[in-house]
Amino acid sequence: MSIISTKYLLQDAQANGYAVPAFNIHNAETIQAILEVCSEMRSPVILAGTPGTFKHIALEEIYALCSAYSTTYNMPLALHLDHHESLDDIRRKVHAGVRSAMIDGSHFPFAENVKLVKSVVDFCHSQDCSVEAELGRLGGVEDDMSVDAESAFLTDPQEAKRFVELTGVDSLAVAIGTAHGLYSKTPKIDFQRLAEIREVVDVPLVLHGASDVPDEFVRRTIELGVTKVNVATELKIAFAGAVKAWFAENPQGNDPRYYMRVGMDAMKEVVRNKINVCGSANRISA
């Protein structure tokens, strides 16, 4: 088994009406927890790392871990560069073996976003690396990125069509009412906008900010064409909450093998639920 491009996973998902979950990773324990569940449920998976993650643990170390687990669990997986903003950074990481990258130029005007994305696409496609980009802008906070509500805006369907045609991007993250982080109230998802985007864009669509979104809402977006669902905040909250509870019950505890496993097990329940919501279980052979 090996680290593969997300395009192979997303093409199958698009053809068969399900979504591939993309779980953000932060260390060896989060990688292990996610893959334990994906192996058990035989679900394809995308492991997503932000620039902040690769500051915490080197890409080369994460890549080695993922390669080893891919062999151990006999399953292909994609290691994905999430919310990267620099061609130079992406180039270095692709040369290190990564075959999936998101270039985030959503903070730029349309023309500048197109120019940046096209430069990344030209390089990545020469390396058999798939490229995701974002049009429209999600609000909220994730990792080192913060976007206030005034700066967020939804994806225009006709602009999305032009954007894909001009850049040759492999998948498109759309802004339809979700946000990074948790919600103070139930989000208002613009399903009609998503349907209109799907009508004019044929590449796989990506839902960012899926943490804390009601399961039925996520399922509806998949019915309307979403083939990659990003989850980050819910994983961290589950892990941290379980570890905090363990220390509350074991104030003298100090063995990482115990409290890390408690956090991992809590995270695994979130992963299990998201796989069920995405409909991705039993999509890879045993």
Curated annotation (Swiss-Prot):
Top-tier EC class: lyase
Keyword Transport carried by entry: no
EC number(s) stated in the UniProt entry for this protein: 4.1.2.40
Pathway the protein takes part in: Carbohydrate metabolism; D-tagatose 6-phosphate degradation; D-glyceraldehyde 3-phosphate and glycerone phosphate from D-tagatose 6-phosphate: step 2/2
Active site, renumbered: D82 (proton donor)
A cellular-component GO term for this protein: catalytic complex
Cofactor binding summary note: Binds 1 zinc ion per subunit.
Biological-process GO terms, alphabetical: carbohydrate metabolic process; D-tagatose 6-phosphate catabolic process; protein homotetramerization
Single GO term (MF): zinc ion binding
Binding site for dihydroxyacetone phosphate: G181, G209, A210, S211, N230, V231, A232, T233
Keywords: Lyase, Metal-binding, Zinc
Cofactor(s) of this protein: Zn(2+)
Binding site for Zn(2+): H83, H180, H208
Keyword Lyase part of the UniProt annotation: yes
Catalyzed reactions: D-tagatofuranose 1,6-bisphosphate = D-glyceraldehyde 3-phosphate + dihydroxyacetone phosphate
NCBIfam families tied to this protein: cbbA, PRK09195.1, PRK12737.1, PRK12738.1, tag_bisphos_ald
Subunit-level organization: Homotetramer. Forms a complex with KbaZ.
Family label: Belongs to the class II fructose-bisphosphate aldolase family. TagBP aldolase KbaY subfamily.
Function of the protein: Catalytic subunit of the tagatose-1,6-bisphosphate aldolase KbaYZ, which catalyzes the reversible aldol condensation of dihydroxyacetone phosphate (DHAP or glycerone-phosphate) with glyceraldehyde 3-phosphate (G3P) to produce tagatose 1,6-bisphosphate (TBP). Requires KbaZ subunit for full activity and stability.
Protein name as it appears in the record: D-tagatose-1,6-bisphosphate aldolase subunit KbaY
